[in-house]
A protein has these predicted regions:
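N-terminal beta1-alpha1 cap of cysteine-dependent amidohydrolase-like domains
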Residues: 9-95, 99-102, 106-110
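Residues at the C-termini of beta-strands that transition into short coil/loop
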Residues: 21, 61-63, 118, 136, ...
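Gly/Ser/Thr-rich beta-alpha loop segments that engage phosphate groups in nucleotides
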Residues: 86-90, 118, 122, 131-132, ...
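Short, conserved acidic/polar surface loops in the N-terminal third of protein domains
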Residues: 92-95, 126-128, 136
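Catalytic nucleophile loop
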Residues: 108-128
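Pocket-forming structural segment of enzyme catalytic cores
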Residues: 129-166
């Protein structure tokens, strides 16, 4: 997961990063409805914090928009690409997924450095010709409720401005 590896990211000053949101609009809307940040907002905050706001981030939503690159922008304009997580599954192969695989194929043929976690890895592996299979034991994601934060948890940035009891 991104949180486990973000301390190892090498982010340069004035780096141009393409942030690819892997979710469909409905999934992002669900995060917002629950009072959470969307996947792309979490990534954006981490990248800005890691770089001390010295990066230029361009956010795109290929699962939502047909024309997702801003006018006059090329994939070659970026030093790096960061691909977010998503509630999608690569083996479902719907239009949103196929568009993202096609984008990944384009990016793999360019000079960009690419970081993907969870969903981003599924897309990149598939685009590179690899196979991703469904876990026979079911979904590995876990939802936790009624969490009582320790003193360390209370001061952790992930829980900033949140209730002590989650």
């Amino acid at each position: 997961m991104f949180f486990l590896f973000h301390d190892r990211l090498k982010i340069k000053i004035n780096m141009k990063i393409l942030l690819v949101d892997g979710n469909e609009k409905e999934a992002s809307d669900r995060y917002i409805k629950m009072g959470m940040d969307t996947q792309f907002e979490v990534y954006k905050k981490i990248l800005k914090k890691k770089s001390k706001d010295s990066v230029k981030i361009t956010l795109i939503h290929p699962a939502v928009q047909d024309e997702y690159l801003p006018a006059g922008v090329s994939l070659d304009d970026f030093d790096a690409v960061v691909w977010t997580g998503s509630l999608l599954n690569i083996y479902d192969h719907n239009k949103s997924i196929i568009k993202q695989i096609d984008l990944a194929k384009e990016l793999l043929n360019r000079k960009n450095k690419i970081f993907g976690s969870c969903w981003g890895l599924q897309v990149l592996v598939t685009a590179a010709g690899g196979k991703v299979r469904k876990n026979p034991k079911g979904l590995e994601a876990i939802l936790a409720k009624n969490i009582n934060l320790s003193e360390q948890g209370i001061v952790h940035p992930m829980y900033k401005n949140k209730n002590k009891k989650q």
